[in-house]
Amino acid sequence: MRVALGVSYNGQAYNGWQSQPSANTVQDRLEAALGRFATQEVHTICAGRTDAGVHGLMQVVHFDTELQRAPFSWVRGTNTFLPADIAVQWAQPVPDAFHSRACAVARRYAYVLLQSPVRPSVDAGRVGWVFHALDEQAMHKAVQHLLGEHDFTSFRASACQAKSPVKTLHRIDITRRAPPAGESTGTHGCVPCYWRFEFEGNAFLHHMIRNIMGCIVAIGQGLYPPEWMRTVLEARSRDAAAPTFSPDGLYFQGPVYGAEWGLPTRTAAYDWLP
């Protein structure tokens, strides 16, 4: 039988999702826990690999097994052997035709950014950080140039193994969580607040969102006009873009599947995310 799992994790301690020789990865920890619960080797396939330091709110994986277990037994049993920063949220039997990666029609990511004169402490490792005020209107204008199907070579890491740099971005939303009423403007007019950037696309290149974030922040700080984003995109050269932004605030929200698979979506447990 084939089983799908929804998995969440804090990526700070891991060298990304994908299993690597002599490396501490989320996939290695998950498969080790599944193996201990199932008392047999288990191999998983995920919906989307994440880089070192990147978090997962609802990674979806599937695996094949001969064991017959109730869905919640897979949840409880696997979590027993997982470290505290990884958790299986749900388990569900799926048809053999289901494939966590191939059946996903889209993928969603969020980047959470703290704007503050002082670096994050409690949120360290869970949010990105800027100490300059960002121009919301300029950032909104800039990301419009990225919507649709494009060659995203300028935002692709040199180590990217994707066959094609052409991807489609369906949506980029930018929201700001305002500070409490009456709060001071802080240093140099930098009002402490959280920014949330949400991306939805058919697929993403290695470091693509972090490279886009570097450009968005540069434009938000007034270093470049919004039109610079199109210039970078059309250059089709990594050298044209801003430096890769920190992985700390990047979250894989999860894949999007057709209703025919009947899989759970993002859980209310993460409504706290700024």
Curated annotation (Swiss-Prot):
Residue sites binding substrate per the record? 109
Q: Name one GO molecular function term.
A: RNA binding
Annotated InterPro entries: PsdUridine_synth_cat_dom_sf, PsdUridine_synth_TruA, PsdUridine_synth_TruA_a/b_dom, PsdUridine_synth_TruA_C, TruA/RsuA/RluB/E/F_N
SUPFAM superfamilies documented for this protein: Pseudouridine synthase
Q: Which UniProt keywords apply?
A: Isomerase, tRNA processing
Swiss-Prot/TrEMBL GO biological process terms: tRNA pseudouridine synthesis
- Catalytic residues of the enzyme: 51
Q: What is its EC number?
A: 5.4.99.12
Keyword Phosphoprotein present in the record's keywords: the answer is: no
**Per its UniProt entry, which superkingdom is the organism in?**
Bacteria
Q: Which reaction does it catalyse?
A: uridine(38/39/40) in tRNA = pseudouridine(38/39/40) in tRNA
List the disulfide bonds in this chain.
none
**Enzyme class of the recorded protein, top EC level:** isomerase
Q: Which NCBIfam families match?
A: hisT_truA
Job description of the protein:
Formation of pseudouridine at positions 38, 39 and 40 in the anticodon stem and loop of transfer RNAs.
The text of the family note is: Belongs to the tRNA pseudouridine synthase TruA family.
Subunit structure of this entry?
Homodimer.
Q: What is this protein called?
A: tRNA pseudouridine synthase A
